Amino acid sequence: MLRRWAQTVEALGYDMLTISDHVVVTPDVAEQYPAPFYEPFTTLAWLAGVTERVALGTSVLIVPYRHPLLVARMAANLNQFSGGRLVLGVGVGWARQEFDALGVPFEQRGRLTDEHLGAMRTAWADEDDYQSGPIPIWVGGNTDLGMRRAVRLGDAWHPLRMTLPWLRSAVDRLKAIAQALERPVPALVPRIVLRLTDLPVTGPERRVGEGTIEQVLQDLEELRLLGSETVVLDPFDEDPAETLAPDRAWQALEIVADRWTWTNSTNQGEPQ
């Protein structure tokens, strides 16, 4: 299944393949994600061997779950062995039962994330030892705290599954936070749901990437206008069974790839 995912994504012309992160499939995790759940660094290392050009990313790695120097080492090795293809999307986590199972204090996950990211960057600065090369860090979190963390510690802000009005407002807040902290505005790299429908989806709760192919293409254009040069498409729509039978997801990715390429070729006069 993983090999087919990798080959499908690369053949369709996409630029990245991402994997999420859970160490223990506790009951709160199992409600959304089925077992087995693959460890991200091991899986991405294997995927590096069956792909040629796509970037390999986490969306997202739960930073407090692992010792930061171990993460720094694994990430550096993976980035080196894959030819510089690793992108590290990170988050603080949400599954309290999983934190309890790992013996990590849930209430301190934000502080731990900040400390761990700082330690990882310090480790990577030792180029003689880690030899990582540049590893982009995308900081997730649909909150002001997440935005502040992205401004202080990340290369990009990586919000997940949102509505367009919310994102427009959030981008303004992100810029204000960066200005207040006197730091550059991080890149905008959203992960959006991909759920194609035959009829238009309307209403204020419509998420970016949800609706007809025309709506999805318009959403991608709106994201471009907001400054996003990279968008992660997430065809998993909260039904664990879909991950075991991903034909619908592959079909949706193919439709978007075909139409997006055609649209850009028509508008710009050259294929993308």
Where are the predicted features?
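Active-site-adjacent structural elements that line small-molecule/cofactor binding pockets in enzymes
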Residues: M1-Q272
